[in-house]
A protein has these predicted regions:
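Short beta-strand scaffold positions
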Residues: 15-16, 85, 106-107
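Short, active-site-adjacent cap segments at secondary-structure transitions
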Residues: 20-22, 42-43, 111-114
């Protein structure tokens, strides 16, 4: 479904280090190299990583994490606030290298949600729920972000 999708051209592409994002970047921008940005990786879910809801639903630590909407970190993992600080730092680092032009970020849903919530604070984190393969075209003027459209 992503291969052949018509996207605006990008002067530079940045991707999470995880394989699924690197593969997606290659599908979306087949003739362009991309730069891997370590801090664009998804949230570290610690002890919950690679487990399903069914496997975790009776775990009190998991229930507490769900009840707080991820505000407390999973055991051995990263809090939503820590992820937001990390990903927003990476975003500002990438943006600071570009005074003009178009960049593309091929990253995870939680990474997108953290960046968009931070830069468009009229909508909270879960308002930016990102499905697989979705994206936003945004304009950045150095101070604020304007969403032009989503797909």
């Amino acid at each position: 479904a992503l291969a052949g999708r018509q996207l605006p051209p990008a002067n530079q592409i940045y991707a999470s280090p995880l394989l699924r994002c690197r593969e997606t970047a290659s599908l979306l921008f087949p003739s362009q190299p991309f730069e891997v940005v370590e801090d664009f990786r998804e949230c570290d879910f610690g002890a919950f990583e690679n487990h399903t809801y069914e496997e975790l639903k009776d775990d009190p630590a998991y229930q507490l994490w769900l009840d707080t909407a991820g505000e407390i970190p999973p055991p051995g993992g990263e809090s939503k606030a820590a992820q937001k600080i990390r990903t927003l730092g990476a975003f500002h680092s990438v943006i600071s290298r570009h005074s003009a032009g178009t960049i593309a970020l091929v990253v995870h849903g939680g990474t997108i949600m953290a960046i968009l919530e931070s830069l468009e604070p009229t909508h909270e984190f879960y308002r930016w729920q990102a499905e697989n393969g979705c994206g936003w075209l945004c304009a950045w003027d150095g101070r604020s972000l304007t969403v032009i459209f989503s797909y």
